[in-house]
């Protein structure tokens, strides 16, 4: 009787007990390729993948003959899923927390030169023990000169992206560096369709550096790939460091700051539409609103994709002449930025918290939000 698993194994790692006819796998020969498991029609062989391998949607992680994990940089899109899923802490994102502490000290707590913190809108759903205003106060106590919403950068981006979409007729978003990297590495024919706009983080960082040349800028958010983004030639001059929400919490803890007992600081730069960038669908809503506010006669037909599997399907459809959409909103994480690998919480109500945060915006339109740019000091 033929055994499919034995034939599937190219390493001759599978043999059979002549008495019981049960399969025996020689671990000295097995390389955990999983071909035997796929070939067995009885599911007698189970292939338990490492959490990091299972989490990686672009198949960038493999193991060598010594069972050490390897990351293929030619495939990796810096989504951070492996970091989040590894239960052993074996994979870590590079931290700039020491560099930020040194920069704050060197600036004499923003007295010699101002250090701006740009906070991602997903922060509104993260710190359950304190209000957002109290968290903003905590950030200032760490030594930052000012705290600004990345959502304001989102307002700026959506305004320009709406114009670009109407001119080109088809566009993919550029806000998520993981999505942009995914296109460049897997769908080169679509690279020309990526929006030319910088991300909200970089757009706002650029503005801050232009009005305050000696300023330093630190982005704080849920994202690992932002740490790679700031190395890009188009971005490196605008954002100095990236911290995750986890690293922000570590800094707050290191100073024994009890945010829940602090007075609230105001954070009211952005519009509702800029703030909802934090969840899937928010970017598309903002582009629609921007077209409306600028009186541009163009109907946006968005395809909203969250998570790399959905992004893959969307990009495959984009190459079809029968596509029925003209804009792809791509986010590397499920549910958008609120599903980021360095979020402090991944709860169903996070989307509700972001929408609530959006509804509290003082600036009701994108145009109003852009109009407050001059007030950033």
Question: Where are the regions that the model predicts?
Answer:
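Iron-sulfur cluster-binding cysteine motifs and their immediate structural context
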Residues: 2-24, 35-72, 77, 81-97, ...
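Nuclease-adjacent, charged terminal/linker segments that flank catalytic cores
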Residues: 26-28
């Amino acid at each position: 009787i033929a055994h499919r698993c034995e034939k599937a194994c190219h390493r001759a790692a599978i043999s059979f007990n002549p008495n019981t006819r049960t399969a025996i796998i020689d671990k000295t020969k097995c390389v955990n390729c999983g071909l035997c498991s796929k070939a067995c029609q009885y599911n007698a062989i189970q292939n338990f993948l490492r959490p990091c391998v299972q989490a990686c949607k672009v198949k960038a992680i493999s193991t060598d003959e010594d069972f050490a994990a390897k990351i293929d940089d030619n495939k990796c899109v810096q989504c951070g899923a492996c970091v989040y899923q590894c239960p052993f802490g074996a994979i870590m994102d590079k931290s700039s927390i020491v560099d930020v502490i040194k920069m704050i000290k060197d600036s004499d707590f923003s007295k010699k030169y101002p250090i701006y913190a740009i906070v991602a809108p997903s922060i509104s759903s993260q710190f359950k023990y304190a209000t957002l205003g109290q968290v903003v106060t905590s950030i200032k106590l760490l030594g930052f000169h000012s705290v600004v919403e990345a959502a304001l950068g989102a307002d700026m981006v959506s305004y320009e992206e709406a114009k670009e979409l109407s001119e080109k007729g088809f566009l993919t978003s550029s806000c998520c560096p993981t999505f942009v990297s995914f296109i460049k590495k897997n769908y080169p024919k679509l690279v020309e369709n990526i929006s030319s706009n910088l991300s909200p983080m970089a757009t706002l960082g650029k503005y801050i550096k232009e009005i305050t040349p000696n300023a330093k800028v630190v982005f704080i958010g849920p994202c690992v790939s932002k740490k790679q983004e700031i190395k890009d030639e188009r971005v490196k001059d605008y954002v100095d460091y990236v911290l995750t929400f986890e690293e922000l919490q570590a800094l707050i803890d290191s100073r024994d700051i009890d945010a829940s007992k602090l007075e609230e600081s105001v954070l009211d730069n952005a519009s509702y539409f800029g703030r909802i960038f934090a969840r899937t669908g928010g970017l598309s809503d903002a582009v629609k609103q921007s077209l409306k506010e600028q009186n541009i006669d163009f109907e946006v037909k968005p395809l909203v994709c969250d998570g790399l599997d959905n992004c893959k399907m969307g990009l495959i459809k984009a190459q079809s002449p029968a596509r029925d959409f003209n804009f792809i909103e791509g986010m590397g994480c499920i549910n958008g930025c609120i599903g980021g690998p360095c979020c402090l919480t991944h709860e169903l109500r996070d989307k509700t918290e972001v929408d609530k945060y959006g509804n509290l915006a003082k600036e009701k339109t994108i145009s109003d939000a852009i109009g407050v740019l001059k007030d950033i000091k």
